[in-house]
Amino acid sequence: MDGKPMRRCTSTRPGETGMDVTSRCTLGDPNKLPEGVPQPARMPYISDKHPRQTLEVINLLRKHRELCDVVLVVGAKKIYAHRVILSACSPYFRAMFTGELAESRQTEVVIRDIDERAMELLIDFAYTSQITVEEGNVQTSLPAACLLQLAEIQEACCEFLKRQLDPSNCLGIRAFADTHSCRELLRIADKFTQHNFQEVMESEEEFMLLPANQLIDIISSDELNVRSEEQVFNAVMAWVKYSIQERRPQLPQVLQHVRLPLLSTKFLVGTVGSDPLIKSDEECRDLVDEAKNYLLLPQERPLMQGPRTRPRKPIRCGEVLFAVGGWCSGDAISSVERYDPQTNEWRMVASMSKRRCGVGVSVLDDLLYAVGGHDGSSYLNSVERYDPKTNQWSSDVAPTSTCRTSVGVAVLGGYLYAVGGQDGVSCLNIVERYDPKENKWTRVASMSTRRLGVAVAVLGGFLYAVGGSDGTSPLNTVERYNPQENRWHTIAPMGTRRKHLGCAVYQDMIYAVGGRDDTTELSSAERYNPRTNQWSPVVAMTSRRSGVGLAVVNGQLMAVGGFDGTTYLKTIEVFDPDANTWRLYGGMNYRRLGGGVGVIKMTHCESHIW
């Protein structure tokens, strides 16, 4: 070949040569027709039946032992199969048959450490795409699926076990999940155990057989659902006395995780302090003395704060997250939706009467307030209030003294505070608060800095104003309002300048996430420790998010929506403090930038009434 395009002459009539009006001569691409010649008719066809029918035939061949090229020997059982099918379904078999292992050349392969019946079920699945997980096979099928790396079967087994969770078996399922590295099942079993602690403890058999480290994992959780710390102490002592000779030396280690300072003085002195096992151990006596000092010396309590003095915050089953307004598809929106963790669903609820972007949202007396914002053409000072029991918005709330968008809103001391924002003319440092009894807004001390796109949070009886923009550039400064003094005080700045960020209180610290600096949208996050007056970095979110909402729902920190610099987002991320990661957690019905978020506790019947 000399590199020139090949000339091809064809005739539409077999046997003819030469050129006529029906002949085609092309240079280059033999599939390309000259201009003016009609393209041949085409009809792509994809068979929906073919994959299923092919598998059915191959499965028949297997059952008749035809064209089988490998025999799996599992215990006393011989299973005939085709290497190509096994390799297509299982990375374990693919590595075995396509590599240099001895099994790649053997016609009989011995598989150890797998139950015979479980292997049969998994091979059947490879040929049929079907398996029935049930109580009688799940404990053998899951380990087998883990060995063969059949992720779908692992997920099916874990889903089955989730549905079987009960106070009488949750600890066994938890241990099973831990053994087989099923992280999601382990997490769900942990949550179930924490929420049903009293019933789990009363089931006795599994609880009493817990190893010390697992008992500590359970009772050290902030989310442990107990009426009082007495339940935790009684559970620990029952566990120790179940096998007193073996467990007596472990009592001091376990007792460290009982929050003795939260007990009543009467119970601490009369029951805990007088228990023979406690009295006979020096470390235990020290823990009791620490608790006594905390209870009897209230003026010293600020210096004695620690894990044992932190009140537990069990999961509130009825907490529901609301996403309100925002900017979507080039316009402000009035739509509102809610997320119910019980059903893991986002549902639309009644819309506001006005479209609102840059709206401030907070919850006061179990009612959701939407303050100010921008409707796409005007800045707003109007306020709406949502009642989740009736699924209705009302507009009979007094307006703020000035129009505000990109405003921060929070509740402190029974008042609704509106902080900063902009009115269309200037960036604001004005702060006012709403009294629901009087239906009236009153101005309080202004911030030292003008702030639009500011985030606010309430912690320890103070109102915090975090970041924002002064109208010229993003801010990293933070100030704190003391309602007793009616004064703002500057505190430690963030590590990053942020406007339109998300802010929430989580595990007694203020988290600030996302936003925008001088040049780009941010995925970074940081948190403020009021004890040390310091900000420290937190692992970044998976997406950049400006105009993001941040809220704590049933003990989970959730980042909602925003803008990544290219796309309006409807995705949600949840922060996992143990793994120090953010993970995606589904999405809303609407994309939302600059929407507000609020959390309301509803009774079970209220959360499903409409």
From Swiss-Prot:
Q: According to the record, where are the Kelch repeats?
A: 320-366, 368-414, 415-461, 463-508, 510-555, 557-602
What is any one of the record's Gene Ontology cellular component terms? PML body
| Chain's gene name | KLHL20
Q: Where in the cell is it found?
A: Cytoplasm, Perinuclear region; Nucleus
**Residue stretches making up the BACK domain:** 170-273
Q: What terms describe the molecular function in GO for this protein?
A: type II interferon binding; ubiquitin-like ligase-substrate adaptor activity
Output the superkingdom of the source species.
Eukaryota
Provide this UniProt record's keywords sorted from A to Z: Cytoplasm, Kelch repeat, Nucleus, Protein transport, Repeat, Transport, Ubl conjugation pathway
Ranges for domain BTB come to 68-135
Report whether Cell cycle shows up as a keyword of the record. no
What is the protein name stated in its UniProt record?
Kelch-like protein 20
Q: What is the lineage of its organism?
A: Eukaryota, Metazoa, Chordata, Craniata, Vertebrata
Q: Give the residue ranges for region: Disordered.
A: 1-37
Q: How does it assemble?
A: Component of the BCR(KLHL20) E3 ubiquitin ligase complex, at least composed of CUL3, KLHL20 and RBX1.
Q: List the disulfide bonds.
A: none
Function recorded in the entry: Substrate-specific adapter of a BCR (BTB-CUL3-RBX1) E3 ubiquitin-protein ligase complex involved in interferon response and anterograde Golgi to endosome transport. The BCR(KLHL20) E3 ubiquitin ligase complex mediates the ubiquitination of target proteins, leading to their degradation by the proteasome. It also specifically mediates 'Lys-33'-linked ubiquitination.
Matches recorded under PROSITE patterns: BTB
Q: In which pathway does it act?
A: Protein modification; protein ubiquitination
